[in-house]
UniProtKB/Swiss-Prot annotation:
GO cellular component, one term: precatalytic spliceosome
A single MF term (Gene Ontology): RNA binding
Region (Disordered): 104-127, 165-233, 320-345, 370-432, 660-711, 822-952
Record organism: Drosophila melanogaster (Fruit fly)
PANTHER family: G PATCH DOMAIN-CONTAINING PROTEIN 1
Classification of source organism: Eukaryota, Metazoa, Ecdysozoa, Arthropoda, Hexapoda
Biased composition annotated in UniProt, kind: Low complexity: 886-896
Similarity annotation: Belongs to the GPATCH1 family.
G-patch domain residues: 153-199
Superkingdom classification of source: Eukaryota
Record GO biological process: mRNA splicing, via spliceosome
Residue intervals passing through the bilayer: none
Name of the protein in its database record: G patch domain-containing protein 1 homolog
Biased composition (Acidic residues): 214-233
Compositionally biased residues, Basic residues: 323-333, 906-934, 941-952
Length: 952
């Protein structure tokens, strides 16, 4: 039992043989065995056996015998050379098979197949190979066949190496010094030791290199002398892809002369020339190799002592090989003659078209020459007679051209003018003449004849002398009236764009009359006329204006003159254009020197501060040249473009007139500004008429323009006005109203929120200095008429915003603020002074600073309280609690607003106090709480509906 437990069985066991039963299958004797082909048919027959089957299956050709597959006509290929037939064309597949008389094998003729080791290897390696090895072969040395079958020329790689300076016996690689060569030899010796002890084949040892080591030690310092590397066989570590032991290759199934077998075979191994060849990638010409004569079917072959054992000779299974039988056609094809089969390839037949010959067609032998003295055919004579009939009737003149007719009539031909001699015809050359002269010139071209009546043509009688004199007088009067009229050709009288500058207008007229087109010629022409005082920029601008004005204000005559060209001059212009060589454009190289500045995006990527605090301009913007603007650049463009087009809208006209006010001495406080309604009602006799009238924008347009470029943080008031309830605006005072109360108490003009640009305008109170002082200083003539401007003039409320800050903060510029935000570690250079030297302030600035401090204190006292943060209330809360919270919040807000109203009544005397505001506010707060409760109930109802729908 123990032995059976430890016994391992693999596979399915054969059925056990019974003792009494004899096995049914008996071994077949040799004389009873039958040789069969791949189809399972009997291959060899007797002289009178086999019958139809033997002749059908064993004939040369296809499986069906000599049945033709396709028919190809050789009628059109008679002239072509006939293909030379080969013995393989008359052989069957069995003859070309493995056991046939001419088995096919593939052999390549490649320059890379055999290596010329005798030339490439050194003398050491050759001597090593010549030494006999045990178990290799009976003949020592290099194989004789390998020496006989050497390639005629070297390989491509060897030829390339020789062209690069390589010589046989040297290694491949860069040249080495003595020290490097010694290290390489030591490394190669280690690799050879490993190959000898752990590899399959021992490599030749370089014993001669040991003698060189002593000489190398002498001149170690001489690094200028280099040597070629030693020629050694590199080690290629092939991956192990089998399960054999180390250095065991096993039975190789590859043919002898294949790549895989040649790489693994030893150099002294015998080469079998009768094995199958391997097809290389380049597919060289095939050749048939093999035994010339076969052996009988029932005879054993002689053992080939030179052959190598192959695994294809062994069976790996006990089962018999069942040959694959091909399906045979047993069904007779329809409409096919016996012995033939239907063609499977589609035949493309050209459809022949019948030629319709005429009834009277008579064939003619065109090779037979006719005599010119032979009589003409009747048909041909009849055709010639009909063709010349119209000439005999006098109609042949229509076949003549004008030259032939002039030659027959004997006329003298007028010499045609060449295209160069003919002047360019101007269809508007008579425009400079008067109207009557042109009418007379037209009437003179007509031939005068008599009046045709019933009796015949009556000749025209000459006019009387008095009538002629009267007509001449009328023509003179008409010529006098039309004398001063501007003609179309005289462009100077029609249009004078530079009439303000007579010299410039004169230059323009000369430029128009010159009719120059080349830019270089125009520049030279104007340079001769322009004064010396003109700068280069003015000269270029004047040239550009002249060209543009000549294009725009070109008379109609010139435009039409270019369109109508005489036919004789077209060819001449084409010839001139072809002969004219292309102009060479001069390339002007400009060099600019700019300071490099990294972009803001690059500074963000590297997490560093921008240089100069980001105040330096971009180099692309600096390099952009300023456009040279001229009036004539925009004359052809449209007035309205997509960018500036606005839809027309009608608004009521409202013109606000600024009223100058007299200001008292500086120590006295400025008077409070009157309301706008009172200012408009009071008539002002000293008012000057307003020079510019404009239609102001509507409040909606102003709000949109102001909020267009603002950030979202500054649009809070706009969002509040849209989304908040109107009750809050009525209950609570806005910040603008509180600001207005403070401004009225101090006598300042009522202002509202504006942009930072308007705020900077108020801050910049210093007078203009330097070269710009004359530009911004008030004129002397108008100074007497206009009163002195007030320090706080009336400014429109929608354009200003006052932020109450200390003067120190307002006097800082943008650069100081940017530099203050930068950490001190990021700043490169000496440390900046902490506190700049203070100068004694002027009395006016000191007074203004005191006013600012006073305003700051009042603003802190009367500043609006911060709005409480709103809490998020869930929809499931009880509506009663919401009502109570809303009422309490409204009561608190109403109490706050009532306190603000009391303060407001104390500060502003002209304003009237509001009575009963608290009662109204309480009613509104109750209504508001009811609305909120209704909204919460509706939202709950909608949420329930959504849940039901999601469940369904």
């Amino acid at each position: 039992m123990d032995e059976e437990e430890h016994l391992h069985r693999f596979g399915t066991p054969l059925p056990a043989l019974q003792k009494d039963v004899v096995p049914a299958k008996k071994p077949v004797a040799i004389e009873d065995q039958i040789v069969k082909d791949e189809n399972g048919k009997r291959r060899f027959h007797g002289a009178f056996t086999g019958g139809f089957s033997a002749g059908f299956w064993n004939t040369v050709g296809s499986l069906e015998g000599w049945t033709p597959q396709t028919f190809k006509s050789s009628r059109g290929e008679r002239a072509s050379s006939k293909a030379q037939l080969k013995p393989e064309d008359f052989m069957d597949q069995e003859d070309l098979g493995e056991f046939g008389i001419a088995p096919q094998g593939i052999r390549t003729r490649d320059e890379f197949a055999n290596e010329d080791e005798q030339k490439q290897r050194s003398d050491q390696r050759r001597r090593k190979l010549m030494q006999p090895e045990l178990g290799v072969g009976a003949i020592p040395g290099l194989p004789v066949l390998e020496q006989l079958l050497r390639p005629v020329r070297d390989k491509v790689a060897v030829r390339i190496l020789k062209s690069m300076g390589w010589k046989p016996g040297q290694g491949v690689g860069p040249r080495q010094t003595r020290k490097e060569k010694r290290q390489a030899t030591a490394r190669n010796s280690k690799e050879q030791y490993l190959m000898e002890h752990y590899g399959a084949e021992g490599l030749p040892s370089n014993k001669e290199n040991k003698g060189e080591e002593d000489s190398n030690n002498e001149d170690e310092d001489d690094e200028d002398i280099t040597f070629a590397p030693d020629d050694y066989e590199p080690i290629f570590y092939t991956p192990k892809e089998n399960r054999f032991g180390m250095s065991y290759s096993g039975l190789n199934r590859d043919p002898i002369l294949s790549k895989s077998s040649s790489s693994s075979a030893k150099p002294m191994q015998h080469i079998n020339l009768f094995g199958e060849m391997e097809a290389q990638a380049n597919k060289k010409q095939l050749s048939i190799r093999g035994q010339a004569f076969g052996v009988g079917a029932f005879e054993e072959e002689d053992e080939d002592i030179y052959a190598r054992d192959d695994m294809t000779r062994y069976d790996f299974s006990l089962a018999d090989k069942k040959p694959k039988q091909k399906k045979q056609q047993h069904v007779q094809q329809r409409h096919v003659i016996d012995g033939f089969s239907e063609d499977n390839s589609p035949a493309v037949l050209q459809r022949p078209y019948a030629i319709d010959l005429p009834r009277d067609f008579q064939p003619r032998n065109w090779l037979q020459r006719r005599s010119r003295f032979a009589p003409m055919d009747k048909e041909r004579a009849q055709k010639l007679e009909t063709a010349s009939e119209y000439k005999r009737s006098g109609l042949g003149r229509h076949d003549l051209n004008p030259d032939q007719r002039a030659q027959i009539l004997g006329e003298q031909q007028q010499e045609e003018k060449t295209a160069e001699e003919q002047p360019k015809r101007n269809p508007f050359k008579d425009h400079s003449k008067s109207l009557m002269e042109r009418i007379n010139a037209r009437t003179e071209g007509f031939t005068k004849g008599g009046v045709i009546t019933e009796n015949g043509e009556e000749q025209q009688t000459e006019l009387a002398k008095e009538v002629k004199e009267a007509n001449a007088a009328i023509q003179e009067r008409a010529a006098l009236k039309t004398k001063d009229l501007p003609s179309a050709m005289n462009s100077s009288s029609a249009f004078k764009p530079f009439i303000a500058d007579e010299a410039k207008q004169l230059r323009y007229e000369k430029f128009v009359s010159s009719k120059l087109t080349d830019d270089k010629e125009i520049t030279e022409f104007l340079a001769r006329m322009q004064p010396v005082t003109l700068s280069l920029w003015d000269r270029e601008m004047e040239k550009k204006e002249f060209i543009q004005a000549a294009k725009i204000y070109r008379p109609l005559v010139g435009l039409m003159n270019d369109r109508f060209v005489s036919e004789a001059n077209v060819q001449a212009e084409k010839v001139e254009q072809q002969e004219k060589p292309p102009e060479e454009r001069k390339i002007v190289m400009e060099r600019t020197k700019t300071m490099w500045k990294p972009t803001a995006l690059l500074c963000k990527r590297y997490n560093i501060a921008e240089p100069f605090g980001g105040a330096m301009l971009e180099p692309e913007k600096e390099l952009k040249a300023k456009a040279k603007i001229s009036v004539f650049d925009y004359l052809e463009t449209s007035v309205n473009t997509k960018a500036n087009f606005e839809t027309p809208s009608i608004f009521p006209k409202h013109i606000e007139k600024s009223i100058p006010e007299k200001v008292e001495t500086p120590p006295s406080p400025p008077p409070a500004p009157q309301p706008e309604a009172e200012i408009q009602d009071k008539p002002n006799t000293k008012e000057e008429p307003s020079k510019h009238t404009f239609v102001p924008k509507t409040p909606l347009e102003q709000a949109v323009d102001e909020s267009r470029n603002k950030p979202i943080s500054e649009k809070v008031d706009l969002f509040k006005s849209i989304f908040e309830d109107s009750d809050e605006e009525e209950t609570e005072l806005s910040e603008q109203d509180k600001l207005a109360i403070l401004q009225e108490s101090f006598g300042l003009p009522v202002t509202s929120t504006t942009s930072a640009a308007a705020q900077n305008v108020l801050r910049n109170t210093s007078p203009p200095r330097g070269i710009f002082a004359s530009l911004f200083s008030p004129k002397i003539k108008d100074a007497a008429k206009e009163p002195a401007p007030t320090k706080f003039g009336p400014i429109e409320g929608s354009k200003l915003k006052i932020a109450y800050k200390p003067r120190k903060e307002r006097l800082r510029n943008d650069r100081e603020l940017a530099m203050a935000e930068v950490a001190p570690e990021d700043i490169y250079g000496p440390k900046l002074p902490t506190a700049p030297p203070q100068k004694p302030a002027a009395p006016e600035i000191q007074a203004e600073a005191n006013i600012d401090d006073r305003l700051q204190q009042l603003w802190q006292q009367h500043a609006p309280k911060k709005r409480k943060a709103e809490k998020w209330v869930e929809k499931k809360c009880i509506s009663g609690s919401e009502d109570s919270d809303a009422s309490s919040s409204n009561e608190s807000s109403s109490s706050d607003s009532s306190d603000d109203n009391d303060k407001r009544s104390k500060l502003s005397k002209p304003k009237k106090s509001h009575k009963g505001s608290s009662s109204k506010k309480s009613k509104k707060s109750k209504l508001k709480s009811k609305k909120k409760s209704k909204k919460s109930e509706e939202s709950k109802h909608k949420a329930k509906k959504k849940k039901k729908k999601s469940k369904h």
